[in-house]
Structure formats: structure tokens, C-alpha cells
Amino acid sequence: MIGTVLSNRYKIEEEIGVGGTAVVYKAMDTLLNRHVAVKVLKHEFTEDEEFVFKFKREASAAARIANANIVNIYDVGADGNVNYIVMEYVAGKTLKKLIKENGKIEFNKIIDYATQIAKALNFAHKNGIVHRDIKPHNIMVTDDDIIKVTDFGIAKASNESTITTTNKVVGSAHYLSPEQAQGIPVDCRTDIYSFGIVLYEMATGKVPYDADTPVSIALKHIQDAAVPPNELNKDIPIALNKMILRCIEKKPENRYQNANEILDELSNVKNNYVNDDEEFTRVMDPAQIQNESNPNNKLDNDDTYYNGEPYNKEQPQEEPQEENEEPKNKIKGNNMLSGKAKKALVASIIVVLILAGSALAFSMGSGIFKPNSNSVSKVKVPKIIGLSESDAKGKVEDAKLKFQVVDRVKSSKPKGTVVTCYPNEDTEVDSGTVVRVDISSGDTDQTLPSLVGLPESAARAQIKQYGCNVGSVTQEYSDDVAQGNVISQSPSEGSQIKKGMTIDLVISRGPEVKKATVPSVYGKTSDSASSILQNAGFGVNVQNKDVTNADQNGIVIEEYPNGYVNKGTTVTIVIGRFNSTAVQPPNNNNGNGNQNQNQNKTPDTNHDDSKAPTGGNNDNQNQNNTTNPNGTQPAGGNVTGTGNGNVTNTPNGTGQK
């Protein structure tokens, strides 16, 4: 790819990164003369038409968002079978590289970086974009400590289907949320989980879950409790420790519900920072330990705690218990396993049971691991889409689940009926799980967003996304809008959208190229000529040239180009510089003794007695010597100008008329 020019515009210069789905190159935008980053979809994905379509559509959706902490997307396109996204080029390091170089990051920078990342997520989420692959590899840090989150180009617009139905694993197992690992539909809270993992890594220098294979890592996300970060780094304040643990809660409803809540919490952590060393040593009973370990200070109905760490109560215990018997947490005798040993044993049993009993549906379409259908506490989400809100609530509660209305959305479905639900219908979930639904508001009209400033391809993709058609596309010159981007649209932003409606676009041709006649500046001084040309809208390039005519010294003797040319063209002017010793071309007088009066004479540098006789022309210094018939000037000969303006050389050095 190096040296390739995509779409006659983006010249690939060097490879700067490789991801799961694409290769990223540094390139030169030859139109705007700036460096950009070009993400090229890997060849194995280009064969999947559905993937390519969604890749472009989601990148176009992400191009709508412009934020100081998000890498801007400039263009989406294809050149032959090469599909690419053009992004802002950021000079700096990835957060992953900084962590590798420094280990853990100090407290103030953690808060600073986390705040900027949360601002980026908050902005994207408010615009309907879920990243789904937040990890330090996708977070750039400039030399000025400005955070730039990248890779929104392959993110999922939250109201659209996911692009992960391609049986290709997208993302990194170390940062996957439990719901991603299980193939459950995701929302903005999956980004909050991944953000928590990044926060954990910044604070400790390590990820909370690691193993030899992605499968094993995914299992840990689903089943294992993370080691509290302040056990790995004693300098982490309790408030930050709790915040990290809440971000990485297994259940989305137990996490922060949006990035704005995270921003508030970060502000509190920063303003109320107290080093743990300043606290008095205290003795805590088991209940206190349990409450410290659970940021929400409550037991989930499917969790039990051992030394403050949650385990699934449905997994085998060391001793069988009666159905209604309380868990036996009390350690008796010296032959009992220690807390750490028991944790290792339980974890190993979990792995064995899941590996043996599950189908290991290893694809991102169906999830890395499906929930264990053999669990006695699982229930199915009832079919409620299309039901009224009250009927849906009744069915959900009859199934021993909880009902929550998330939003009322514009939909073609009857007003007051369920449009979507999460988890999906027929999904097996734990008893008591919250089923979140969207209810139809009955209003199907949507408003048209602004397409101004978008590349034409991105604008077309958005129009198609809204179920509309592209109407007339005209082009106009613009000094403000880059070539190929939208200048205006009709109907305008805020107009109500009706399915099938036509939207017209005006596309920029870039700045208008205007022509003008180059003014003649022959005979002008350098400053005067430059001023005249610049005022006429031209650039100026000044050169000097030796001349033997003193009258040409310091003035324009040549000018090019001339005539009718593009405004802004650089005009070269040549300024004469008098040099009496400048070499002249050889003459061709053939010894006839006569020269044109306008020609120049090269003075004899060996004698100073050259002079014009009385009554002769005084122009003899501008005339050329005439050589004797044999083409040579005798040594020591003098040159004397004659009255008729002709000069001849004689052997004895006397001039003759």
C-alpha cells in the first residue's frame, strides 16, 4: 500500500497500526495538503458485502460527532476493492504504550485522562453512538496530555444492528464486557465496563482478568471477581477504588448508567481525595468487609460472598446444603481451604463445568459464551413486543422479572405499546433480572439532521439510513467548505422526515479559480513591480540577472508568465544587475569594421586611454570593438571611438574614421 494514492487524493506514506479488522496508515491528503490517518479494511472482510455496508454506514454515522476528545472522521470511501475511512491524524502515543512505559499512572493523571475519556463517551452516547471497543490501544495521548479516543468508525450506532454478525471477533478479550462475551445486546453501559477496565489498568499497570486464551479471559469477565485495585496499588484512594469496581460490575444495572454520572463521580473523587495512609488502622467485622467489597452495599439475588468477594451461589460448594439452609461461610478447623485456595478451586470448577456443559458458541454473532441453560434459577423473558405497557409489565412480573421503561420513542407501532426490550424475548436470564423496554410514543415523524460539512458519501449514507432518497446534487464553489463536502441541503435541518422523501444536496467544488491578466511591470523597480503584482492577486518570485547596460540596472527586464492566467499564480520578474565585465556572446562582423550603434562595447581592461574624439558620438562605451580582418585584436592596441560611431582596431592602437 505504501505509495498508493487512494481516490486520486490520499497518498499512503507509512503503516502506523494494525487492528482486528483494519490496517491504519499515515497518509497525505494531497487536496488539502495535510496529514491524515487512513484506516483500510482488511482483505478478508472486503468479501463480506454486509460487513462492508455496515462498516461504511457506521463510520458515516460516527462522522457526525465532533468533539475535542474524539478523533474526527473526515471521509468514507472506496477505491476498487479497498474500503477505507479517513481520520484526523494525531501525533502522540497510545495510552497502552504509556502504561507499558510507566507501569501504573499517578493519581492526578488518572483523573485527568479518565475525565477526558468520559467526556468523549458522554458526547458519543448522547449522539446515539456506542463505541464497543474501548481499550487503551484506541486512546491517543498527545504531547500536551490531550486525550483523543479513536475507532468510532467501526462502532455501532445504538439504534442499528451490530456489525459483529460476521463470525469475526471484533475487539480485545481483555476489555470485553460480560454482555459482549455472552452475545447479549449492548448499550452505552458496555462502554462504561470497558472504561472501568482501562481505569483499572491505569491505576495498577495490569488488567484485572488475564489468561492464555481469549476464551479463558472471557470466562473470567463473566464469572470471576476482580482483585480490588488498591490491593495491587496501596496508593489508590478508597473512593477511586470503589468507582473502578462499580464500573466493572457484572450486571449493567449495577454500573454507572451513563458517562455523565462518571464525570460527576470523578469530580467527587478528585475534590475529596484523601490518601489511605492518613486513615487510622481499624478492625472490621465480616459484614463491613462485605460492604466495602460491594460498591452498591447490597447482595445480588444470585450472588453470595466469601471474604467479601462474590461467587455464583449455584456453583458446587464444598459441603452439600439443604435447599433452605443458609450458606456456610464460617471456616472450621485447620483442614479447611484458605480463602484463596477455595477461590482457585471454585474458579477451576466453574471453568470445567462451562467448558464441558456449554456449546462454546465462539462467535461474536452469538456471543463467546451463551448463558448456561441448565441453571435452575434461569427464566425466559416473555414475548412482550407489541403488547400494551400494562400487559407487558404483567407478563414480565409473572415471570419473576422486573419491568422498567427506559424511553418513549417515535415509532410506527401503536402508541403505548412495547417497541423493543432488553434482554431480548426468549432470552434465559436470572430470576429478578430487570427487563428494560422502549414504549412507542405513536409519533413517527423524525427531524432531519444537519448534513452540512459532511462528505458527500457520508451525507448519502445518512439520507439512506433515514429511509429517504437523494434528489438533485449540484456543485458550487465555496471558500469555506472543503471540496466534496455538503454546502447546503433541502429540506433544511430540523424539517420533518417522511419515509421516501427526496433530499437535495449542494456539494462544494472548493474555492473558485479566478483568472486575470498579468499586469506588465517592465522597467519598474523590484519593489514597485512586486506591489503591482501582489495587488492584482498574484504571487511574486524575484530573480536577478547580470547586464552590461547600466540603464537596465535595478529594473524589471523580464517577466513571465504573462497574459490571462489563474489568480494566485506566481509571476517571476527578473531584475537587471549592472556588471561591466559580463561576458557577451561573440559577434559575427566578419571583419567589416562596422557595428550597430545599439550594441555594447567591451572596454579594454589593459589600458585606460580609450576615448571618443571631439565631435564623435558619446555612445562609444555601448558599442562593440570591431576586430581586424584576421579576427584578433593585437596585444597592447588602443581603442579610440570615431565620430561616426564605428570603432576599428588597428595594430598600432589608433582609431581611424
Curated annotation (Swiss-Prot):
NCBIfam families: PknB_PASTA_kin. Residues 286-334, 581-657 are annotated as: Disordered. One of its GO terms (molecular function) is ATP binding. Residues 10-274 form the Protein kinase domain. Residues 375-441, 443-509, 512-577 form the PASTA domain. Residues 288-298 have a biased composition (Polar residues). It catalyses: L-seryl-[protein] + ATP = O-phospho-L-seryl-[protein] + ADP + H(+); L-threonyl-[protein] + ATP = O-phospho-L-threonyl-[protein] + ADP + H(+). ATP binds at residues 16-24, 39. InterPro entries: Kinase-like_dom_sf, PASTA_dom, Prot_kinase_dom, Protein_kinase_ATP_BS, Ser/Thr_kinase_AS. It is an enzyme of class 2 (transferase). It comes from the Bacteria. This is Probable serine/threonine-protein kinase CA_C1728. Belongs to the protein kinase superfamily. Ser/Thr protein kinase family. The keyword Methyltransferase does not apply. It comes from Clostridium acetobutylicum (strain ATCC 824 / DSM 792 / JCM 1419 / IAM 19013 / LMG 5710 / NBRC 13948 / NRRL B-527 / VKM B-1787 / 2291 / W). Keywords: ATP-binding, Kinase, Nucleotide-binding, Repeat, Serine/threonine-protein kinase, Transferase. The keyword Electron transport does not apply. Its EC number is 2.7.11.1. Residues 584-600, 613-637, 645-657 have a biased composition (Low complexity). The active site is at residue 143. Pfam families: PASTA (PF03793), Pkinase (PF00069).
